[in-house]
């Protein structure tokens, strides 16, 4: 895994990692007990779009479109979030899409 998640990398949850909604909270957890709690609505949407079929850039573009947000800022925030998820061992980075 690289130090920072690249915009052209394809994120997907690692095997055994899932995202669950509990009431108003969304929790990402894995079999080893690592959890990430308190995701805001845009972070939840990023997680939902990380299905192994889209680049990080296309995930950010979709979120920016859905939430009418600045695309550059959403890309920056998305890459930071994905880098954190990768460091926690919650997502895998697939090959770059060319």
Which positions does each model-derived feature cover?
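Long, charge-rich, low-complexity alpha-helical segments
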Residues: 32-98
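Long, low-complexity, charged/polar intrinsically disordered regions in eukaryotic proteins
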Residues: 1-31
């Amino acid at each position: 895994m690289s130090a920072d998640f690249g915009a052209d990398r394809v994120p997907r949850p690692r095997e055994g990692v899932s995202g669950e909604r509990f009431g108003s909270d969304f929790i990402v957890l894995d079999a080893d007990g690592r959890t990430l709690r308190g995701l805001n609505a845009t972070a939840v949407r990023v997680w939902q779009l990380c299905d192994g079929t889209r680049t990080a850039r296309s995930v950010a573009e979709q979120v920016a479109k859905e939430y009418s947000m600045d695309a550059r800022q959403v890309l920056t925030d998305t890459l930071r979030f994905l880098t954190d998820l990768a460091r926690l061992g919650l997502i895998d980075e697939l090959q770059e899409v060319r």
